[in-house]
Amino acid sequence: MAAADEPKPKKLKVEAPEALSENVLFGMGNPLLDISAVVDKDFLDKYSLKPNDQILAEDKHKELFDELVKKFKVEYHAGGSTQNSMKVAQWMIQEPHRAATFFGCIGIDKFGEILKSKAADAHVDAHYYEQNEQPTGTCAACITGGNRSLVANLAAANCYKKEKHLDLENNWMLVEKARVYYIAGFFLTVSPESVLKVARYAAENNRTFTLNLSAPFISQFFKEALMEVMPYVDILFGNETEAATFAREQGFETKDIKEIARKTQALPKVNSKRQRTVIFTQGRDDTIVATGNDVTAFPVLDQNQEEIVDTNGAGDAFVGGFLSQLVSNKPLTECIRAGHYAASVIIRRTGCTFPEKPDFH
């Protein structure tokens, strides 16, 4: 064939060997509009909120959202844990656009339109399942000092349906294009069957499946769903509070975070070609990383405490930074360095927002 004589292959060699394709990173979760405000202790007490927690809204929180908007100076940001991480990863990757894919459910309303436009602005390839039974989900971020208490009203986010969205050929094709998958544990409360379908696909095709413990209540009240997916998890993320709750629920009988990481790393695993890695962040304290060989502590970047504006999204940003390097098969130390960098940028700004370009080398 004449085509074989054309000097096309040569041109390819000049390009970076790790050139990324669109949709290389896949995320699925709860798309929420964050409504954040600096509040006082009285407000937290009134709604019996802990200063640093993530919970799902109950009946007693019905008035919270209205009161937050009326009483305090609020800011609206496109949020939702996994969606935040996809945006940060895409920001760190820069080119190509749409390297990160995101699936989730929204309502057909103003907030839904905001989420769509914000995802497009961030160059994330978002494919929402849109339905009109529930409005787009919101998350109240109640900030006091360096703490944030999150109250999520999932609404539409809770309506994601595997058979109505994930299973559709055009959507599943995007799953097949990815090399790395990330789902926040929060999504186990919505569609565990969707999480399992993606996790199994990753294991069968020797691709990297990553999950976040997300919040203490996931390990407590969604233990069965969490442990059903755990054998498929190649990289597990979490913070120190989530790690402690997970250890207690699993009967690890230790409060030492390194030991918790080691025991979690050793839990049963389906794809034996990949050793599990467990990564626990601890705010300003060292990030703990357990691999098959050892447990290591990585110090975070020195941060002037006065510069910290809003720690909401720091964990999501860490994951986003980490994944941005993982898709290019960078070593673990580089992935962690990128995670620490991204988190350090995000905590100096309100919401999970970032400047135009990263300064990471």
Curated annotation (Swiss-Prot):
Pathway participation: Purine metabolism; AMP biosynthesis via salvage pathway; AMP from adenosine: step 1/1
Species annotation: Rattus norvegicus (Rat)
Residues given in the record as adenosine binding sites: 34, 305
Entry's Gene Ontology cellular component terms: cytosol; nucleus
Residues annotated to bind Mg(2+) 1: 48
Catalytic function, reaction form: adenosine + ATP = AMP + ADP + H(+)
Coiled coil feature spans: none
EC primary class: transferase
Family listed: Belongs to the carbohydrate kinase PfkB family.
Residue positions of the active site: 316, 316 (proton acceptor)
Residue sites binding Mg(2+) 2 per the record: 147
Protein name, UniProt field: Adenosine kinase
